[in-house]
Each structure stands twice: as structure tokens, then as C-alpha cells.
């Protein structure tokens, strides 16, 4: 693969940006934990504030877990801008986000993670057969391989967050120039922007 960086329309080196330049080869970096913070003055933030002004332990049932699933409130207008063939998968991703955000202190469903992986792999393989020369091939392959590696060891809400955001990133590469979620991916999917060394197609490197 040749290397570019991508931030879905909000980064100069997006694959669809004009004049994108190639950069030296780098391997995808692991994702970083997302630390959700409750807005000051909210009920949950006041409840966690001790008498001495310090913050108490985070309540997993509160906003912290919910903040890991920013796709829960996706407007229908965004879905309508995706290609028809990607809309069913994106709906499944949003449904999984909502389901996971309601788990509270219970772990996320590994069955849901397996299902999302299976659905993404099917969509990726179908797309790959007709689009091996596509400009977004490196990023989609990197996203697919990341999900294939993460799904079997999914245990925490952070894992589920990374899996769902990566799957959504895969979908939204199809409408990078107009995607209203670009800001989310710039925050949560930066580990996929450098896709050099992403390996072969996931259909050849991943099983399950």
C-alpha cells in the first residue's frame, strides 16, 4: 500500500482531499483509551464530587460508559448520505452502540462483537472484490484487520468502543467528503489514519 493519512474530510491528507501527499511508511498505531468526562454542574458530576472538592470514583452506570458510544444519537440524515449497500451495516453498528451503552457496569456482549465482526467481514469482502484499486483500499483493509484482531478478545467497553468506531469508520470512508461524523473519527480513529503496512486483505488474514 502507498501511504496517506485520512480524517474523513477534516484532515489535509484525507484520501479524498485535493493534493494529498504520500508520507513515509508507518504501521497503524494502537488505539488509545477514551476518557469520558461528565460535564461540570450535571447531576452525575455533583454526585461524584466529595465534600473536599475532589472527584469520587466514577460510576460505570453513569455518563462515563455512555460517552464511549457517541454513535447512539446518529441522525437519520447521516445514514441517508451513505451508499445504499452500506446502510444496513451502519444501522447494525448504531443498534449495537445503543445496546452496549445500556449495559452499565455489566461487560459488553461478546456475541454482539462477534456479530459485528462477521457483518463487517462480509461487507468488506463484497466491496473488495470490485474495488481493489480504490483509493480507500488501505484504510478499509487496516480497519478490517483491526476489527478481526480485536473481536476475539473483546472484554471491556473500551474494546467495544474501539470495535464499533472502527466499523463505522469503514462505512463512512465511502462518503468521506460529506460525512457529518468526521469529527468523531478524527478523535477516536486516529490509529487508522496511517494505513501503511496494513497487511493483506482481511479475507486472507482473518478467520471466523
Curated annotation (Swiss-Prot):
Listed GO CC annotations:
host cell nuclear matrix; viral tegument
Expression triggers:
Expressed late in the infection cycle.
Can you say what this protein is called?
Virion protein US10 homolog
InterPro entries assigned to the protein according to its UniProt record, in alphabetical order: EHV_Unk (IPR000714)
Q: What is the lineage of its organism?
A: Viruses, Duplodnaviria, Heunggongvirae, Peploviricota, Herviviricetes
Please tell me where this protein is predominantly located.
virion
Q: Where is this region: Disordered?
A: 17-61
Q: Where are the zinc fingers (unnamed)?
A: 167-179
Subcellular location, record wording: Virion tegument; Host nucleus matrix
Organism superkingdom: Viruses
Taken from the record, one Pfam family name reads: Gene66
